[in-house]
């Protein structure tokens, strides 16, 4: 009995340091506050307005509009309004053999002063050769030009194309025209036109 009491006292004596060790207060943690991070983002860019309307009040496209909606407009019948910027004229032949001239074609743009060829739209297919145009213009000036019967399916030869004219064209917007011309951004295979502003008439 005495020996058991001694063993209990020894066990309690050994446990005292352990209890004191567990009861010691923990070391205080130092929490350091990080500085506030201010985001350095670029300003939201202001997008400029489109240079020209997609379509006009009469439903015709601008050249800008045709090409900005290329997926929807390519290989479709369209109407497009623009100014005639340049008309192809075959070069004069001074020495034989003469090179075969290109088929008649012209370029239109959204403004009269547009000088970037990439912003011009080629119009093709309104005549087979320059002789057809010259003859039709001569007859028209004499009041004797008669357009072909619509039942024939032949298109009238345009006689009022002048650089500076504002014209609404109708035709097939395509990458490859019937006259052998091609353009990856599209060209117009002519079907018809109406002249909105005629500079030749204004000069008279």
Label every PLM stretch briefly.
Residues 22-204:
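OB-fold and OB-like single-stranded nucleic-acid-recognition modules
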């Amino acid at each position: 009995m005495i020996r058991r009491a001694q063993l209990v006292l020894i066990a309690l004596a050994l446990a005292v340091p352990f209890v004191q060790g567990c009861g010691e207060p923990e070391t205080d943690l130092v929490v350091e506050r990080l500085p506030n991070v201010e985001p350095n983002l670029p300003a939201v860019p202001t997008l400029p307005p489109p240079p020209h309307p997609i379509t006009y009040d009469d439903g015709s496209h601008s050249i800008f509009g045709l090409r900005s909606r290329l997926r929807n407009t390519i290989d479709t019948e369209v109407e497009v309004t623009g100014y005639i910027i340049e008309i192809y004229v075959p070069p004069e032949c001074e020495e034989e053999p003469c090179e075969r001239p290109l088929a008649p074609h012209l370029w239109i743009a959204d403004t009269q002063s547009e000088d970037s060829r990439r912003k011009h739209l080629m119009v093709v297919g309104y005549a087979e050769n320059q002789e057809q145009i010259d003859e039709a213009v001569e007859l028209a000036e004499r009041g004797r030009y008669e357009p072909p019967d619509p039942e024939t399916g032949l298109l009238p030869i345009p006689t009022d194309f002048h650089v500076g004219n504002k014209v609404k064209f109708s035709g097939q917007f395509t990458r490859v025209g019937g006259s052998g011309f091609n353009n990856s951004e599209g060209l117009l295979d002519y079907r018809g036109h109406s002249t909105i502003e005629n500079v030749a008439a204004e000069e008279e």
